[in-house]
Curated annotation (Swiss-Prot):
InterPro entries: Ribosomal_uS2 (IPR001865), Ribosomal_uS2_bac/mit/plastid (IPR005706), Ribosomal_uS2_CS (IPR018130), Ribosomal_uS2_flav_dom_sf (IPR023591). The gene is rpsB. The keyword Ribosomal protein applies. One of its GO terms (cellular component) is cytosolic small ribosomal subunit. The keyword Ribosomal protein applies. Belongs to the universal ribosomal protein uS2 family. This is Small ribosomal subunit protein uS2.
Length: 246
């Protein structure tokens, strides 16, 4: 597999944490020091951990498993959408709806409604409605597309979840934890790594850093799909045992 290098990380600013006064003591072992009251993340720790996460994702994708990309804050949403689409993975880029995983049955009903409205908007049904009714359905369609468009083809629960900014996506992580879905997460110096199976200590705000994480993850998914069609079953067992060992 093509690995991310220290140089890639330095150029993207992965090593710049948050102001020292906002630090989370649970991230202490990943912090190299401080400069101008900003914590500096130890990339000698981050680099192997990131490459481990990429290997895990590549192996998962080789077994035709689904990785859900999650990043709903403004700086991440657009890149999440683009990179997930590039590798054909489901994503949540707007807002995490409570129960997206733990109450998937209800979510599935909303996805069905989204598909019905999509079909109606294309088959001429909207044109036969009153202006008011057509407008209401168009608004419903837009709202559902914004919330669920990225997972409408997921077809069931994901096999792993990749999260940018674990603080911002704490509800998503707790839902994944409840269901035993492995979590890969970018954890900045102000965040807690709890509930994350594959920790990537790094800056979760800088656009170039976010692009590096997501671009590399999408590449890993594409490589895995390309490399593997066989051995999927043993492989899912291996992945499950890896996640259980933490």
């Amino acid at each position: 597999m093509s690995q991310v290098t220290m140089r890639d990380m330095l150029k993207a600013g992965v090593h710049f944490g948050h102001q020292t006064r906002y630090w989370n003591p649970k991230m202490d072992k990943y912090i190299f020091g401080a400069r101008n009251k900003i914590h500096i993340i130890n990339l000698e720790k981050t680099l192997p951990m990131f490459n481990d996460a990429l290997r895990f994702v590549e192996k998962l994708a080789a077994g035709k498993n689904k990785i859900l990309f999650v990043g709903t804050k403004r700086s991440a949403g657009k890149i999440v959408r683009e990179e997930a689409a590039r590798c054909g993975s489901p994503y949540v880029d707007h807002r995490w709806l409570g129960g997206m995983l733990t109450n998937y049955k209800t979510i599935r009903a909303s996805i069905k409604r989204l598909r019905e409205l999509e079909a109606q908007s294309q088959d001429g049904t909207f044109e036969k409605l009153t202006k008011k009714e057509a407008l209401m359905r168009t608004r419903d369609l837009e709202k559902l597309e914004r919330s669920l468009g990225g997972i409408k083809d997921m077809g069931g629960l994901p096999d792993a979840m990749f999260v940018i900014d674990v603080d911002h996506e704490r509800i998503a992580i707790s839902e994944a934890n409840k269901l035993g879905i492995p979590v890969i997460g970018v954890v900045d110096t102000n965040s807690s790594p709890e509930g994350v199976d594959y920790i990537i200590p790094g800056n979760d705000d800088a656009i170039r850093a976010v692009q590096l994480y997501l671009g590399s993850m999408a590449d890993a998914v594409l490589r895995g799909r390309q490399n593997g069609a066989g051995g999927a079953d043993e492989f899912v067992e291996e992945v499950a045992s890896e996640a259980a060992q933490g």
